[in-house]
A protein has these predicted regions:
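Low-complexity segments
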Residues: 65-67, 113-214
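Flexible, surface-exposed loop/linker segments and immediately adjacent secondary-structure boundaries
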Residues: 1-109, 113-123, 153, 159-161
């Protein structure tokens, strides 16, 4: 996949060894570990539903607005976010169990025959079947390299100067720090100035347009 390519309903993504990726979804960010396979089942202004078939993701939800819905489906369960927070979802190498780690926040796990289980912050939950009857509850494990990368990426967002000028729900707002600076004009207000721009530059002359179905 190309950097900054919009992803939409029906798109699939596989990360090979040593690869990492980040998806911005409105008020949430999905960070993806190596050897992970996922598909976007539904994505619009109200609903984000992702099918995780292998590997590990970190879901960081900054806000859950009225009517919004974040769901992660795995081979054994469906996890739905209830509150803003940080959630990690791991699928076992065999694919027959799913671990939900709730760093912060809360959610509901759904299984077969309307089974459900509430999960809350500070715990990891491993579900070994689709009925949610075979499960274990643990303390959160020590951070690994993927957790550390997710933390560093989150800090980059939190410390972004552009948060002072742009809503954090604007996808890619933190990139403005890297590619320009902020100033102000008495007749307009805050203005972002791109850096490294050649003389005579004008918008829309470079690059290309593409239509991505929602």
């Amino acid at each position: 996949a190309m950097i900054n390519r919009p992803m939409s309903t029906g798109d699939a993504l596989y990360l090979d060894r040593a690869a990492l990726a980040e998806l911005d979804i409105g008020a949430a960010t999905v960070r993806i570990d190596e050897r992970t396979s996922l598909r976007i089942l539904e994505l619009d202004d109200q609903r984000a539903q992702i099918e995780l078939t292998a590997g590990t993701i970190n879901l960081s939800v900054r806000n859950v607005y009225e009517g919004q819905y974040y769901e992660i489906d795995t081979p054994t369960l469906a996890f739905v976010v209830e509150q803003p927070g940080i959630y990690r979802v791991d699928i076992s190498p065999s694919g027959d169990s799913t671990m939900i780690s709730v760093v912060d926040g809360s959610g509901i796990v759904y299984g077969q025959d309307n089974a459900s289980y509430s999960v809350s912050n500070g715990r990891s939950y491993r579900f070994n079947d689709t009925s949610l009857t075979d499960y274990q509850v643990f303390s959160l494990p020590e951070r690994d390299e993927f957790d550390q990368w997710c933390l560093e990426r989150a800090q980059r967002y939190d410390e972004s100067e552009s948060r002072r000028y742009v809503s954090e729900d604007v996808i890619g707002y933190s990139d403005l720090d890297e590619y320009g600076t902020w100033g102000s004009a008495s007749s307009y207000g805050s203005i972002w100035y791109p850096s490294g721009v050649a003389v005579g530059w004008a918008p829309y002359r470079n690059g290309r347009w593409a239509w991505i179905d929602p």
